[in-house]
Swiss-Prot record:
The keyword RNA-binding does not apply. The gene is hisG. Pfam families: HisG (PF01634). This is ATP phosphoribosyltransferase. Gene3D superfamilies: Periplasmic binding protein-like II. The keyword rRNA-binding does not apply. It comes from Sorangium cellulosum (strain So ce56) (Polyangium cellulosum (strain So ce56)). Heteromultimer composed of HisG and HisZ subunits.
Amino acid sequence: MTKPLTIAVPKGRILKDLIPLVRRAGLDSTPLEENDRRLVRPTADGAFRYVFLKPDDVPTYVEYGAADLGVSGRDTLLERRHDLYTPLDLGIGRCRLVVAGPEDTEVPDLPRVATKYPRIAGDHFASKGVVAEIIPVHGSVELAPLVGLSHLIVDIVETGSTLRENRLEVLETVTEVSTQLIANRASYKLRSDVIRPLVERLRAATAGAGR
């Protein structure tokens, strides 16, 4: 019996965007839509099994071979720098990683920067010749400049409404972010007969969504 292909998917908002894409690709999305607490859910035909994880954990499971494929944000991949193959941009979860700060505030030459993405932020400021003190935080990044923890933040922005509500403004875009299909390097080679057709079906579904 052929071993099912294991696909790691993130819980939360991205999963809601992923379901219509999976449907358009002609794949069984039923396990993704089931409202239960099982973390491993096979498809009816046994060809695939979905593993439900916290978004930050998806690349780790794929890199170490616990999952053959996964769905992960480009921001996580850039920050964590796992050894993975990225065959397809799924075109969902689009947003920006930006530098932001208080409105009408002069930024010092040696700024403190609060962020969930210390490696990306450090590389960004270093590339501009700016010596910045990077302060890792894990939640409510917008709060940091309001209470004096930092002068700037580097964070994900979708609509910008949270920044505006906290009187912060975007100063520059670090990079565009979207959701990627990722693959374990060994699986992509050894199970290419299964994975590559799946990638092409998702590619066609992604292209169709853009029309």
